[in-house]
């Protein structure tokens, strides 16, 4: 099947419809969640992928860091402060950084060996929402998402489907989350200024309109 390509300042994303998800190691599945009043829901990650990658490259917990200025625009302010504290030399002026950054993701994760796709999604959606979201049903259509991370030259492949949930948008936006991964649930429609918005909306629109 043909694929649609999106390119942002940090990613090249290929999206295509598929008929099934292969069963192999390290398969990741995600969902565009649809509220009972038909609004698409995504999540804001508590930690940016850039900060996570930088910290994973440390030789020790107390290592000093050398960080490209280009990476700072893809981190939260508290992470930039932590990076600044560990720099080999100099400091980072937070006032010069775009404070509106937000790391958007879809709910989901890695399939455990004994799980089906839907079982994995149900578990991940419950865990990442602090058990506030309850699943009504899953859609049948599938999309394969291939992402090339231009910042760190890494490639990721995942799969996505629709998940209908029982809660309304207003109820979901009132939730306070305390888990380690997700800081907030959000309406996708409200995130049009985010660098991932165009391809996330394309995924949503493709899945919701598939026959």
Residue ranges with predicted function:
Residues 2, 21-22, 192:
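Compositionally biased low-complexity segments enriched in polar/charged residues
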Residues 8-11, 50, 98-108, 113, ...:
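Nudix hydrolase/Nudix homology domain
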Residues 12-21:
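Short, basic/aromatic recognition patches
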Residues 21-27, 153-155:
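A short catalytic or substrate-binding loop motif that flags glycine-/basic-rich loops and adjacent residues
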Residues 28-35:
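Short beta-strand scaffold segments in enzyme catalytic cores
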Residues 39-127, 131-132:
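Conserved Nudix-box catalytic region and its N-terminal flanking loop in Nudix hydrolases
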Residues 147-149:
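Extended charged low-complexity segments that act as oligomerization/scaffolding linkers
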């Amino acid at each position: 099947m043909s694929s649609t390509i999106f390119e942002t300042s940090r990613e090249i994303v290929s999206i295509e419809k598929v008929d099934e998800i292969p069963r192999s190691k390290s398969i990741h599945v995600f969902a565009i969640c649809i509220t009972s009043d038909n609004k698409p829901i995504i999540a804001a990650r508590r930690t940016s992928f850039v900060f996570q990658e930088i910290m994973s490259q440390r030789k020790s917990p107390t290592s000093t860091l050398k960080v490209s200025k280009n990476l700072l625009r893809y981190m939260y302010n508290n992470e930039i402060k932590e990076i600044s504290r560990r720099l080999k030399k100099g400091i980072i002026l937070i006032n010069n950084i775009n404070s509106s950054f937000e790391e958007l993701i879809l709910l989901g994760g890695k399939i455990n060996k004994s799980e089906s796709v839907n079982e994995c999604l149900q578990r991940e959606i419950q865990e990442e929402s602090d058990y506030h979201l309850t699943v009504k049903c899953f859609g049948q259509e599938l999309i394969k998402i291939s992402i090339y991370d231009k910042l760190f030259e890494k490639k990721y492949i995942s799969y996505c489907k629709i998940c209908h949930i029982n809660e309304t948008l207003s109820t979901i936006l009132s939730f306070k989350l305390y888990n380690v991964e997700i800081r907030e649930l959000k309406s996708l429609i409200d995130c049009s200024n985010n660098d991932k918005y165009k391809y996330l909306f394309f995924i949503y629109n493709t899945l919701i309109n598939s026959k």
